[in-house]
A protein has these predicted regions:
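A cross-family kinase active-site recognition segment
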Residues: 111-173
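All-alpha amphipathic helical-bundle segments outside canonical DNA-binding/catalytic cores
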Residues: 281-292
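Juxta-kinase regulatory segment immediately upstream of eukaryotic protein kinase catalytic domains
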Residues: 1-20
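Helical subdomain adjoining the active site within ATP-dependent kinase catalytic cores
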Residues: 302-327
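An alpha-helical support segment within catalytic cores of ATP-dependent transferases
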Residues: 2, 6, 136, 157-205
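Active-site activation/catalytic loop segments of kinase-like enzymes and analogous catalytic loops
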Residues: 235-278, 293-311
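Active-site acidic catalytic loop and adjacent metal/ATP-binding pocket
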Residues: 28-39, 189-236
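ATP-binding pocket architecture of kinase catalytic cores
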Residues: 40-136
Length: 327
């Protein structure tokens, strides 16, 4: 991008010139995305006119909520007109703070995974305790069930995943089990619907992974990338972030009961980390197991594993699925 263009845009935000820039172009077809890191202080973000002033204002308020609990997050800047967005040809642009810390994915071999995981999980508990039912967004998080997230079409992602699992079971001649899985899912969702509107929720970053977690000296310090931010029911958020996984090693070496019990134990251990910072109310205590049931049977990585494991050892995988739906 031409330096004069950058200087002109930055001047609208009260930033006078720059000495260094790094351009990151992640454009995909018609989806134009250009980020320009300026002097490791600012990020100029240019994309299609899909981002709105209201959405950026909501993200900026969320950033302050994270900072309030001791988690760094990039603030947004307003231009001289008092707006976050500025026009740039056929696109729009805005400016965010640059946080000069390494990403976790860059330091994974130098950090203790369990330490970072637990620090991140504790921050989830702190955020939920501090911000529940405060300044909620109309946009739902990608974890959402019942209400749809922006990328959902007709059904939420977990229902879509479950439908894929059911289709695979039927294709293997396991029609009875497929119907049982559907009934299990429907019953859990029906119980959640009865409580749904009264469950505490808050706005979350919504896409925690090693590519947007910042670390310093082996510890979690902050988050970037709030494009997937949205409102989420706290206990659903907790279950999704503590899903863990049935590892290939466990699946290969242990029987179905051991695999399932190990998975359950790991999930509870990680959930307990969140709950060291957050106390469930009575309604959440009633709902959390049904959210966990839905996560186990229909989160994307789980369904992909089940489909693969059905190919490797159908009998063992069916036993695991039956443990899930009988629990």
């Amino acid at each position: 991008m031409d330096n004069k263009e950058i200087i002109h845009i930055l001047s609208e935000y009260g930033i006078d010139g720059f000495s260094d820039k790094t351009e990151i172009d992640s454009t995909n077809g018609d989806d134009y995305r250009l980020n320009v890191i300026i002097d490791k202080k600012y990020v100029l973000r240019i994309n299609n006119a899909v981002m709105t002033e209201e959405r950026l204002a909501s993200i900026d308020r969320l950033v302050e909520k994270y900072r309030r609990i001791g988690v760094l997050a990039p603030r947004l800047f307003k231009n001289k007109e008092g707006d976050y967005l500025s026009a740039h040809g056929d696109h729009v642009c805005y400016v965010s703070e640059y946080l000069d810390y390494p990403l976790w994915e860059e330091k994974e071999n130098e950090t203790d995974v369990e330490t970072i995981r637990k620090e991140v999980l504790r921050s989830i508990g702190r955020l939920s305790k501090k911000s529940s039912n405060e300044d909620l967004s109309d946009v739902m998080s990608m974890w959402s069930i019942i209400d749809l997230a922006p990328l959902d079409v007709d059904v939420d992602e977990k229902q879509e995943n479950l439908d894929l699992l059911v289709e695979n079971l039927k294709g293997l001649g396991e029609t009875e089990l497929a119907h049982e899985v559907e009934a299990f899912n429907d019953n859990a969702r029906e119980r959640i619907r009865a409580l749904y509107k009264d469950l505490p929720r808050c706005v979350i970053q919504g896409d925690l992974n090693a590519s947007n977690i910042l670390i310093e000296d082996g510890h979690f310090v902050g988050l970037i990338d709030f494009n997937m931010a949205g409102t989420e029911v706290n206990v659903n958020h907790f279950c999704c972030e503590t899903n863990e996984e049935i590892t290939e090693e466990d699946f290969a070496e242990k029987d179905a009961d051991e695999v399932y019990e190990n998975w359950k134990r790991e999930q509870q251990e990680m959930l307990d980390v969140i709950l060291s910072e957050y106390q469930l109310n009575d309604l959440e205590k009633k709902a959390i197991e049904d959210y966990r049931r839905i996560c186990r049977i229909s989160m994307y990585p789980n369904v992909m594993s089940f489909i693969e494991y059905l190919k490797r050892d159908k009998e063992k995988t069916i036993k695991i699925l039956r443990r899930i739906i009988s629990d």
